C-alpha cells in the first residue's frame, strides 16, 4: 500500500499535466515517485530565453510536511544558484520553517522558472555571476551560451515512463567555476616552446644545413656519378627480354633492391668509363648512354631474329604462290 507522500505526488503530477505549463517538463524516474527529473526553460524577454536547465528533485516520505531537495544537474552561472552544491536559493526550499503544506510540485517548478529568469542581486550566493551581470550583461549572455543548450523537446507529453528503472542513473553535478576554469585553460592555451621556435632560427638546424651543403660541394661529382650509374642500371634492366626478366625474378625470393655502385661496377667494369663520359658532357653522355644500351642488348636471340628476317627477304614470292 502506498503512503501519503506517494498519493500527494500523484495528485501533483496530474495537476501538472492538466495545466501544461509552458517551458516546464517533469517526470518521476522511480516507482515510489520520490525521484524526479525536470527541465525548465527560461522565460521570454529574459537573458535565459531559449535556454533549458535540467534539475533533479528528491522527495521524502515526509512530503508535504517538509520541502524536497532540488539540485541542478549542470550548475548554471546564476547569482541565486550555489556554484558548489547546485541548489537554488529559494527561501521555502532552504528553510523548512518557511515551507507551507499548500505548496505543490507545480508551485515549486514555477518558482524555479521565475528565479532563473529574474535573478535577485541582493545577497547572491554566486558573487561572480552577480558582478558580471551587473557590470556587463552582454558578457553574461556570452558566458551562459558556453554551457547551456537550446531547448529540444520531442513531445509535450508528461506521462509516466513505461520502465522507470531505465531512467534511473547516477547524476553528477558540475560547478560552473570548475567548468569555466577548465574551458579557459583549453581555449586559451599557448603553444609550447618547441612549436613556437621557428625552424630557421634553430642554431642546430642551421649548423647541420651548412654541414650538408659543404659535403655536397665537396662530393658533388661523386653524387652525380652514382646517380648516373644507377640510372644506367635501371634502364638496362628495363630493356631486358620479358622471359629472361621473369625467370630472374622467379629465382629471387626477396624483393628486388637497387644495387650499390660498387656492385654495378663489379658486374660490368666497363660501366665506369661509360658513366664518366656521361657525367663530363651532357651531349656526349647521352650518346655514351645510348651506345651502352645497344652494346648491352646485343644478345644471341637478337642475332637469330636478324638472320630470320634476312632469310625471309631472300624468299621468292612467286615460288611460294606456286
Curated annotation (Swiss-Prot):
GO biological process, one term: protein ubiquitination
Pathway(s) this gene product operates in, as recorded in its UniProt entry: Protein modification; protein ubiquitination
Keyword Cell membrane in record: no
Active site, UniProt feature: 89 (glycyl thioester intermediate)
Region forming the signal peptide: none
Keywords of this entry: ATP-binding, Nucleotide-binding, Transferase, Ubl conjugation, Ubl conjugation pathway
EC number: 2.3.2.23
InterPro entries noted in UniProt: Ub_conjugating_enzyme (IPR050113), UBQ-conjugat_E2_core (IPR000608), UBQ-conjugating_AS (IPR023313), UBQ-conjugating_enzyme/RWD (IPR016135)
Short name of one Pfam family: UQ_con
GO molecular function: ATP binding; ubiquitin conjugating enzyme activity
Catalysed reaction equations from the record: S-ubiquitinyl-[E1 ubiquitin-activating enzyme]-L-cysteine + [E2 ubiquitin-conjugating enzyme]-L-cysteine = [E1 ubiquitin-activating enzyme]-L-cysteine + S-ubiquitinyl-[E2 ubiquitin-conjugating enzyme]-L-cysteine
SMART domains reported for this sequence: UBCc
Post-translation changes: Autoubiquitinated in vitro in the presence of UBR5.
Disulfide bonds: none
Domain UBC core: 4-153
Family: Belongs to the ubiquitin-conjugating enzyme family.
PANTHER family: UBIQUITIN-CONJUGATING ENZYME E2 (PTHR24067)
Stated role: Catalyzes the covalent attachment of ubiquitin to other proteins.
Name listed for the protein in its UniProt record: Ubiquitin-conjugating enzyme E2 U
Gene: UBE2U
